[in-house]
Amino acid sequence: MSKYRIAWMPGDGVGNDVMDAAKIVLDAMNFDAEYIPADIGWEFWCKEGDPLPQRTIDILKDTDCALFGAITSKPRDEAHDELAPELQDKGLVYFSPIVKLRQMFNLHTNLRPCKAYPGNPLNFRDDIDLVVFRENTEGMYGGVEFFPLPESVYDALCENPRMKKWKDVGLENVALSTRIMSVGGCESICNQAFDYANTHGRKSVTLLEKPNVLRETGGLMTRIFRAV
C-alpha cells in the first residue's frame, strides 16, 4: 500500500500539461503515492452545472492532499451560455471551484515565492528574493455580492451615511461587492508571515494595504499587523 493518497486534479487547459510534468518529477523521485483522479473544472460546469462535483469533495476528504493544475473561469453570462441546454433554466450560478475549495478547507494562505536566479536574461533585477503571503478566503474573496442591490441590503448599509448617495442612482443600477475581514483571519495570515520570516532568516515583513482609504478593513489589518 502506498504511503500517501493524493487527489489528482488536472482541471482545464494547461493544467493537464502541468500535471503531466509534475508526474514525471514525482516518478523520478520514486515518490511513494497513489494518485486518485478527481474531476474539477469547466467541463463539469458545462456538462453537470457544477465545476466541483460532490464526488470530488468526497475524494479530497479521504486523501492526504491534492495536486491541482488549472481551471477556466468566465464571467456570469458567459458561464451560463456555455451550460448544456437542459441546464440553462435551472438557475445555476458559476462560482469558482478554487475559491470554494479554499473556503471549504480553510486554505486561507496563498504563499508565492518570487526569486531571481543568476544568469536568467529575463530577470527584472538580479537581487529579487521575496515571498508573498496573500489572503485567499476573506476580503474580496468572500464572494458576497449583489446585483441589483436589494432594498433590505441598502437600508442596512445606510447606517453609513456615504451609502445614501446610491439611492439616486437607482438600486437596480448598483452592483455591490463586500470586503469582509475578520480579526482571526488577519491574525492568522500576519502570524504566518512573521513565523516564516523568523524560520527562514528573513529580515523584514512588509504589509501592502490601503488604510487611508479603506479605513475599517485596511485599518483592521494594519493594526493587527503592527500588534503581531
What are these regions (language model features)?
Residues M1-K3:
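Basic/polar N-terminal segments that are highly enriched at the extreme N-terminus
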Residues E43, K74-P75, V213-R215:
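Short, active-site-adjacent cap segments at secondary-structure transitions
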